[in-house]
Regions:
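Non-catalytic, surface beta->alpha helical segment in thiol-disulfide oxidoreductase systems
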Residues: 72-74, 114-159
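Short active-site neighborhood of thiol/selenol oxidoreductases, capturing the structured segment around
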Residues: 49-64, 89
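A short beta-strand-turn-helix
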Residues: 36-53
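Extracellular/periplasmic catalytic domains that process cell-envelope and extracellular macromolecules
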Residues: 48-49, 81-84, 116-119
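N-terminal targeting signals for export/organelle localization
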Residues: 1-33
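Short, internal strand/loop/helix patches
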Residues: 90, 101-118
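Solvent-exposed coil/turn segments that connect beta secondary-structure elements
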Residues: 61, 88, 94-97, 129-131, ...
Length: 166
């Protein structure tokens, strides 16, 4: 009678230790040279003031490609140079029930991500100060791919604003 109880207790203890270590590895860590991530509310206010675009990194806690972009791509000097010059960076947890306010509407981060067309993680969205999506892309992007994606979106947005003003 005691033997199954001891075995069950040992299995649960090992499972607890395993889960603790697994979640410890996926929790956010301080990354040197990481962008100064803003909330969507802050980014939209700043974009309205200075005309820069908003880049939104939609991630999932357990996503290894999301972690790789966070650790290796966003802090890269060439990526940071483009972000710092032309963008306000935002991070959204695509599975979070935490609320945010976008264009006066309160919703969960998950609802916001889905409203942007989320199909897979990571999902990167670039929008203007009005909340108009300029471009989006799903999946991992390396440094060159992300910087080119941002430059293309910036050029596309410049073309849109040139057309609307003339």
């Amino acid at each position: 009678m005691k033997r199954p109880l001891i075995i069950t207790a040992l299995v649960l203890a090992f499972l607890g230790i395993f889960l603790y270590n697994a979640f410890d590895e996926v929790t956010p860590e301080e990354i040197e040279n990481a962008p100064d991530w803003l909330s969507i509310e802050e980014a939209m206010i700043k974009a309205e003031e200075d005309g820069r675009l908003v880049i939104i990194d939609i991630f999932e806690v357990g996503c290894q490609f999301c972690r790789a972009m966070n650790r290796d791509v966003y802090p890269a000097p060439s990526t940071r140079a483009v972000i710092d010059r032309d963008f306000h960076p935002v991070k959204i947890n695509g599975n979070s029930e935490e609320t945010l306010t976008f264009q006066g509407v309160e919703m969960t981060q998950q609802e916001f991500a889905n409203s942007l067309g989320l199909t897979a993680f990571p999902f990167t969205v670039i929008m203007d100060h009005n909340g108009t999506v300029i471009d989006s892309r799903r999946g991992y992007m390396g440094v060159q791919d992300l910087t080119q994606f941002m430059r293309n979106a910036r050029d596309k947005a410049s073309g849109l604003s040139d057309n609307s003003s003339g």
